[in-house]
Amino acid sequence: GLDIWVDKEITTADSAEIDFKYYGGSDKYTILVCLNDKNKYRAELNGSPVEINERSAGIIEITLGGDVKGGKLCVCVKE
């Protein structure tokens, strides 16, 4: 929660673009994104693919290393 600051967020039912900064000191942290449960998703951080875990339909879990101090996270429908 309080270790991540969202500078900008653009969301639709099927996608999310999130500009964020991480201020914590943990070795890793997790971001959850909730989108339409009818689709399968992929994610990119600063244009590079990142691994996701779909906790349940539409709930996208992205775990990043603590050395990732921010960037642009994009989650969109897998093509």
Locate each region found by the language model.
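Intrinsic-disorder/low-complexity, polar/charged segments enriched in Ser/Thr/Lys/Arg/Asp/Glu/Gln
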Residues: 15-19, 28-30, 59, 72-74
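Short, surface-exposed loop motifs enriched in S/T, G, D/E and P with embedded aromatic residues
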Residues: 50-52
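Surface-exposed beta-strand/loop patches in extracellular or lumenal glycoproteins
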Residues: 21-39
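Surface beta-strand/loop "capping" patches
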Residues: 1-27
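Short strand-turn-strand beta-turns centered on an Asx-Gly dipeptide
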Residues: 44-48
